[in-house]
Swiss-Prot record:
SUPFAM superfamilies membership: MFS general substrate transporter (SSF103473)
Chain ranges passing through the membrane: 21-41, 50-70, 88-108, 166-186, 217-237, 255-275, 283-303, 308-328, 351-371, 373-393
Identification of the protein by name: Uncharacterized MFS-type transporter YfiS
Pfam assignment, any one: MFS_1
Location in or out of the cell: Cell membrane
InterPro entries for the chain: MFS (IPR011701), MFS_dom (IPR020846), MFS_trans_sf (IPR036259)
Species classification: Bacteria, Bacillati, Bacillota, Bacilli, Bacillales
Protein species of origin: Bacillus subtilis (strain 168)
Molecular function as annotated in GO: transmembrane transporter activity
GO cellular component: plasma membrane
Primary residence: membrane
């Protein structure tokens, strides 16, 4: 009989507990920073875009380096220092009086944040039993997506009940608590072997090795490209939803918030389902997720003239978008965890973090440009058609790969006979 995931897994439970608090802290901080910029520092739309860029750009640049550090040094120590750094940066936001100060602090915090994810993912692979790695990744995804739903809601409640500055103090406390929990994690088991003089290599060479590992695995590369395209379109949807909502008569002002919340709920549902089903074909998940996202994105503009029913279906479309993204993102994370050796995982996850963050930025920026150029409704439709085409290509690729495997197997059997 198969043992439950968390039986005798104190280290894994400690890591996930720290991740839960840290992820909530991330979403509390995002809401508090946006509120501070918009209502106290009177940021313009361009200022808000620069604010998001100052948070995202360091992740893109430092992703591969952070991954290398996660493979070279103790991941527990890296995560601990990352949380302490984020806590101190968050407290500093209380004393901000100019927007440029907020840009600097967000960039510094982003540098600390970029250290956390590759180290956490590498530690997850190290601590989770091989037989339960799929469940562990699903639980980790459930934590992240639950935080996306409950973090902003909690942050809004705290801001309404107290003040923005109070939320910064609470947020810093969350990061400090996460650091305290991380103190009880075991040190990395693979470090003693990985850091022997014979195996030490130059930093740039190590980063290249991580990127080359991705190139050598066609399925991993396909998953990464699909995840980036899907994330790109999802960010267009999130960033331009408020513009599309203007075409809905009688739409409540909080509709954009509902759309973002149900998108997180869709990803949460997918994470829960994926953790219970053994994945036999990753390409099937990639193609299904891309097709569903294409249908939901392309169909959203046609709902604007349907009154209350259209608004309800529009919210449901964002639920489908979130679930569809989960069908690509979560199996891809499982694929990486199950195929990448533990001493390469930091570098590979660092490269993935850079690529997906770049896709998010391009989605946020490109969505505005595309909507200005051809109109927001047509932008949704074009993106939907593009995704459907990519989903069909992936599905055809799956069929071709299966046919080749069948022919090879049949040929081998004939040769043996």
């Amino acid at each position: 009989m198969e043992k439950p995931l968390f039986r005798n897994q104190k280290g894994l439970m400690t890591l996930l507990a720290s991740q839960t608090i840290s992820s909530l802290g991330d979403w509390l901080h995002i809401l508090a920073v946006l509120t501070l910029a918009a209502f106290q520092l009177h940021a313009s739309p361009l200022d808000m875009s620069l604010l998001m860029m100052s948070f995202a750009l360091p992740v893109i640049v430092l992703g591969p380096v952070s991954g290398l550090l996660a493979d070279r040094f103790d991941r527990k120590t890296i995560m601990f220092l990352s949380e302490i750094g984020r806590a101190l940066t968050v407290i500093s936001c209380v004393y901000v009086s100019e927007l440029w100060q907020l840009y600097v602090l967000l960039s510094v915090q982003s540098c600390f944040s970029s250290l956390f994810l590759p180290a956490k993912n590498g530690k997850l692979k190290e601590l989770a039993p091989e037989a339960h790695i799929q469940q562990a990744v699903s639980v980790s995804s459930i934590i992240d997506n639950s935080s996306k739903i409950f973090g902003p809601a909690l942050g809004g409640t705290l801001i309404a009940a107290f003040s923005i500055h109070s939320v910064f103090y609470i947020n810093a406390g969350a990061f400090f608590l996460s650091a305290v929990i991380l103190f009880f994690l075991p040190r990395d088991a693979f470090l003693q072997k990985a850091n022997t003089p014979q195996e030490k290599t130059a930093a740039l060479t190590s980063i290249k090795e991580g990127l080359q590992f991705l190139k050598r695995m066609p399925l991993l590369l396909t998953g990464l490209l699909t995840a980036c395209v899907v994330l790109f379109v999802l960010q267009i949807g999130d960033s331009q939803a408020i513009i599309l909502i203007r075409s809905f008569s009688g739409a409540p002002p909080e509709l954009a918030g509902w759309c973002m919340a149900v998108s997180g709920a869709g990803m949460l549902l997918t994470a829960a389902i994926t953790g219970r089903r053994r994945i036999t074909s990753y390409l099937l998940y990639f193609s299904a997720g891309t097709l569903l996202l294409g249908l939901a994105t392309g169909g959203a503009p046609f709902l604007s003239g349907m009154g209350i029913a259209g608004i309800t279906l529009f919210i449901f479309a964002f639920f489908i978008m979130g679930a569809a993204f989960g069908l690509v993102h979560i199996p891809f994370q499982i694929l990486v965890q199950t195929t990448v050796p533990v001493d390469y995982s930091g570098r590979v996850f660092g490269a993935i973090q850079s690529a997906t963050t770049l896709a998010s930025i391009l989605g946020m920026a490109g969505g505005g440009v595309l909507a200005e150029w051809i109109g927001v409704s047509l932008a949704f439709l074009v993106c939907g058609c593009l995704l459907i085409m990519i989903g069909l290509i992936t599905l055809i690729g799956k069929k071709i790969a299966e046919s080749r495997r069948y022919l090879v197997t049949k040929s081998n059997k004939g040769a043996q006979g």
